[in-house]
Design a protein with these regions (language model features):
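Hydrophobic core positions of alpha-helical segments in small-molecule transporters
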Residues: 39-43, 103-107, 133-136, 149, ...
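Helical "lid/switch" subdomain of P-loop NTPase nucleotide-binding domains
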Residues: 128, 139, 191, 235-237
Length: 256
């Protein structure tokens, strides 16, 4: 009996490794075949590089006020001109990239953690749990994202962390739907059934077996969502619901 159990365990491990290798291969194939994913990744990478080296790229302090130089046009001294307070717009655009990136990454991480966990629970347990999570997700999804985000901003207020939480919560449904479909396609596979027979807990099966085999679509979704979240942050800042002045953000710069 012990030998049979060991054989089943080894077979289950082989199946897991083979499935993960297949998913990795499919992930890279999908990544390089979808132009929108590549474009999203390149844009995010460019923003990351600008944000990292912002201190070296900014010719002026983005918050430095110079009344004699206000409302100037583009010139050799000020590539994008200056605003009504004489602040260099090129420096503020670069500084805004750092703020937007921080908000975007935090929001995507929050959305991914909450949405992936709820989607995995819904798909794995099914029944009433699935109905509650799925129906709640659908109810949130029918509300326009910007309207939902504005409502949450009224509750949480401004600030980088609060804005990231607001955008993270509003994007949670994307991960719930994606992860639920992944779990439904994985949980009946042989190595999951073998794990149940070996006495593995539901927690271990979900986070040690199902989640690692779903990482590829999660990464693709996160890559796409970073860009979308940055645009949402810009929209909220444009409406005056984002980060308070004088902190430079892209939306606030567009708003003037």
């Amino acid at each position: 009996m012990s030998e049979a159990t060991q054989t089943e365990k080894k077979q289950a491990q082989k199946e897991r490794k083979a499935y993960r290798a297949k998913k990795r291969k499919l992930f890279f194939k999908t990544l390089f075949s979808r132009k929108i994913v590549l474009v999203s990744a390149i844009v995010v990478l460019l923003i990351i590089l600008i944000a990292i080296f912002a201190d070296f790229l900014m010719p002026y302090n983005p918050n430095q006020i110079s009344i004699p130089e206000r409302n100037q046009g583009m010139s050799a001294a000020h590539w994008l001109g200056t605003d009504e307070y004489g602040r260099d717009l090129f420096s503020r655009v670069i500084a805004g990239s750092r703020v937007s990136l921080i908000v975007g990454l935090l929001a995507v991480i929050i959305a991914c953690v909450i949405g992936t966990t709820l989607g995995m629970i819904a798909g794995y347990f099914g029944g009433v749990v699935d109905d509650i999570i799925n129906r709640t997700s659908e109810a949130v999804r029918v509300i326009p994202q910007i309207v939902f985000a504005i409502s949450l901003c009224a509750v949480f207020g401004g600030g980088i962390l609060n804005l990231a939480i607001v955008l993270g919560i509003s994007n949670t449904t994307v991960y719930i739907r994606m992860m639920r479909s992944q779990v439904l396609s994985i949980k009946e596979r042989d190595y999951i059934m073998a794990g149940k027979l070996q006495g593995n807990s539901n927690f271990r099966l979900m986070f040690h077996h199902i989640l690692p085999n779903s990482i590829s679509p999660i990464i693709v979704t996160m890559t796409q969502q970073v860009g979308n979240t940055i645009l949402s942050e810009a929209g909220l800042s444009f409406l005056g619901l984002g980060i308070s002045k004088p902190t430079a953000t892209w939306g606030a710069l567009v708003n003037g």
